[in-house]
Design a protein with these regions (language model features):
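Hydrophobic faces of well-ordered beta-strands that scaffold small-molecule active sites
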Residues: 62-67, 88-91, 120-125, 144-146, ...
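Alpha/beta enzyme core
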Residues: 49-53, 71-91, 95, 105-116, ...
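Short gly/pro/ser/thr-enriched loop/turn and capping motifs at secondary-structure boundaries
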Residues: 96-98, 151-153, 278-283
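N-terminal amphipathic alpha-helix/helix-capping segment at the start of soluble metabolic enzymes
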Residues: 43-64
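Alpha-helix boundary/capping motif
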Residues: 2-7, 16
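Short, Lys/Arg-enriched N-terminal segments with co-localized hydrophobic residues
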Residues: 11-14, 20-43
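C-terminal alpha-helical cap/extension of soluble enzyme domains
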Residues: 257-328
Length: 328
């Protein structure tokens, strides 16, 4: 079977060879493996987060970004997105990547996107340096985050701008972080004892000087498991929304009451990250099955229960973010 030119966007034919190579890397245009002889079909390829988040910003909803740990997580999150007809972002942290590598996770999520009826983006969460982000670009990730929040304001700007410039050249959006989201993200340093809020004036300057396409802000949330009642400072969300025009991102959302998250979305949050509670849900389902079936040695059986727990949780989160039906 030959690949028809109708499977490829018109602008692709007029690009330089270098730009075509970049476009292939980002959008992964390919033929459908299930197409019969003589049939022409285009895969639902991975998409970037740029249009996804701009649509959310215009429509006053948020896209859920879910950290995936393995194939079961990918399949479970996609099942929820399909059922709710929601756009979805799957993301991996450097800590998760250490278990297999960028290419393994890219392969899994790319395969999921090709079978999906909803938009799927693959995002590098908390990119821990310029080199890591370049590796993600080269692998085919369609969105990256550079986390310079532990640096000084000026050093964060310099680092973020270097990655944002590279992302712009490759057509890949770049998320940055300004302010301190508390707790500990995977293998990253713990953040304690600092102001949890991003300054709106600094946010405006930061976005203008770096060219980042979305911004994760500190509004009182924390990574990991909360040891006290979480609280989102909605006035900070509103002030930053008024100060910048790029989509805003909320980290450390696992365990935050739904009503607080929903209000933050109404106030301008466009992307909401979830990680810890997916791990908890999967482990809950897996361990419950093993407790009832201690002689089981087929990992697919307890994994199925873990996947079911994730799917149900993600459906609830997507409903709360008001993203249901936005992929139709």
């Amino acid at each position: 079977m030959t690949i028809s030119r109708t499977c490829i966007p018109a602008e692709f034919h007029t690009m330089s060879a270098a730009k075509r190579k970049v476009k292939r890397l980002v959008n992964n245009y390919a033929r459908c493996p299930d197409a019969g002889e003589g049939e022409e079909q285009t895969l639902m390829a991975l998409v970037t987060t740029e249009k996804m988040l701009k649509d959310a910003q215009a429509g006053h909803y948020a896209v859920g970004a879910f950290n995936v740990e393995n194939l079961e997580f990918v399949m479970a999150v996609l099942a929820a997105a399909e059922e709710t007809k929601s756009p979805v972002i799957m993301q991996t942290t450097p800590g998760t990547i250490k278990t297999a590598g960028l290419d393994y996770f890219y392969g899994m999520v790319k395969a999921a996107a090709e079978r999906a009826s909803v938009p799927v983006a693959l995002h590098l969460d908390h990119g821990d340096g310029y080199d890591r982000c370049m590796q993600a670009f080269r692998t085919g990730y369609t969105s990256v985050m550079i986390d310079g929040s532990h640096e000084s304001f000026e050093d964060n700007i310099a680092l973020t701008k270097s990655v944002a410039d590279a992302g712009r050249a490759m057509g890949v959006p770049v998320e940055a972080e300004l302010g301190k989201v508390g707790g500990k993200e995977d293998d990253g340093p713990a953040v304690e004892g600092e102001s949890p809020y991003t300054d709106p004036a600094e946010a405006k300057e930061f976005v203008e000087r770096t060219g980042c396409t979305s911004l994760a802000i500190g509004v009182g949330t924390s990574h990991g498991v909360y040891t006290s009642d979480p609280h989102i400072e909605q006035s900070v969300v509103k002030a930053i929304r008024d100060a910048v025009d790029v989509p805003l991102v909320l980290h450390g959302t696992s365990g935050v009451p739904d009503e607080q998250v929903a209000e933050a979305v109404k106030n301008g949050i466009c992307k909401v990250n979830y990680a810890t509670e997916l791990r908890q849900a999967y482990t809950k389902g897996f361990m419950a099955y093993m407790a009832e079936n201690p002689a089981c040695f087929d990992p697919k059986k307890p994994a199925k229960e873990g996947m079911r727990e994730i799917t149900e949780l993600v459906k609830i989160r997507m409903t709360n973010l008001n993203s249901v039906g936005k992929a139709e």
